Amino acid sequence: MLGSVKKTLFGVLCLGALCLRGLMAEPDAKELVSLGIESVKKQDFAQAKAHFEKACELKEGFGCVFLGAFYEEGKGVGKDLKKAIQFYTKGCELNDGYGCRLLGNLYYNGQGVSKDAKKASQYYSKSCELNHAEGCTVLGSLHHYGVGTPKDLRKALDLYEKACDLKDSPGCINAGYMYGVAKNFKEAIVRYSKACELKDGRGCYNLGVMQYNAQGTAKDEKQAVENFKKGCKSSVKEACDALKELKIEL
């Protein structure tokens, strides 16, 4: 009799599990991207690809971008720049700023497509409009040097500033450099300080130089040395050289 009860209970539990499995929702597009990232961390590129493909089909731009990166780098698939462009394009069309920037890189470098700096600048522009910080920095550089777009220093600075506000340290450094050239040292210090806070050793080194030379601030050798040390620890050769010149060990 007891055996029958156990069998009955086991049967009910199995049915319950089946019911629960049936009620569980399929992962949505963003969840699929997260699952794909977890698979990448485990080096399971086949499973990651499956998750990203599904996410891309569900119009999650970031999933398309990951697929593009797989094809560009040959991770879990054969290297195929044409497919990379296809998926980056879809990601960009779905308003993923990262995808627009990576697509811009391929056009700028002529990888899988004819080299086209003008078209690259258009993709960088969309990337920046979508608040992708690195897209703003690269677009700023194109305006700074007049590559693929007319030279416009004011626009370049505005783009560097936007990138810096979005916490891209190269944007902060480039803005600081432009302020330094214009002898607006106080503004340069603000940008270099932010780059240093973002743990970019180049920003720390530049800030140290200004503190040591009393540019836009009172001379502060002690703080300058601290910033040279931060720069040197980040493998900035100039910062290490400055410490050697001052006969200070790291």
Swiss-Prot record:
TPR repeats lie at residues 29-62, 67-98, 100-133, 134-169, 170-202. Its main location: secreted. It comes from the Bacteria. Disulfide bonds join 56-64, 92-100, 128-136, 164-172, 196-204, 232-240. GO terms for molecular function: beta-lactamase activity. The keyword Repeat applies. Residues 1-25 form the signal peptide. Keywords: Antibiotic resistance, Disulfide bond, Hydrolase, Repeat, Secreted, Signal, TPR repeat. Inhibited by cloxacillin and oxacillin but not by ACA derivatives or metal chelators. It catalyses: a beta-lactam + H2O = a substituted beta-amino acid. InterPro entries: HcpB-like, Sel1-like, TPR-like_helical_dom_sf, TPR_rpt. One of its GO terms (cellular component) is extracellular region. It is found in: Secreted. Pfam families: Sel1, TPR_8. Its EC number is 3.5.2.6. GO terms for biological process: response to antibiotic. Slowly hydrolyzes 6-aminopenicillinic acid and 7-aminocephalosporanic acid (ACA) derivatives. May be involved in the synthesis of the cell wall peptidoglycan. Belongs to the hcp beta-lactamase family. This is Beta-lactamase HcpA. It comes from Helicobacter pylori (strain J99 / ATCC 700824). The lineage of its organism: Bacteria, Pseudomonadati, Campylobacterota, Epsilonproteobacteria, Campylobacterales. The gene is hcpA.
